[in-house]
Amino acid sequence: MKVIHTTAWDVQPGKVAEFLVNCHQAAEIHRRHGVEEIRLVHSFAGPLPVMTYAMIFPDGETFGKFMDSMPADPEWVSFMAAASANPSAKMVSQSFGQDLMS
């Protein structure tokens, strides 16, 4: 059964373009580590407008391997250092669960 990991982001004013570039860069790295599909959802309603980055994995085992391998990827470590130095967004929440319709 597929599993989904989401991160909701509050994008800083004037930084949407930068955030989108960062999402595309992160997606390239994430796909190399087993992510099957990636979605970026722009919410228009709710407590505040957010962009939610969703990673879809074929199963929990693949997600576990992803979590184990990411900290050792030098490109990911470099990307995170650069993105964290001048953030384009603030993390609002994260979630992880099974896709009951897969």
Residue ranges and their predicted role:
Residues I4, A8, H33-T52, V77-S102:
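Glycine-rich beta-strand-turn "strand-cap" elements at beta-sheet edges
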Residues A17, E61-F63, S102:
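Residue-level signal for secondary-structure boundary sites
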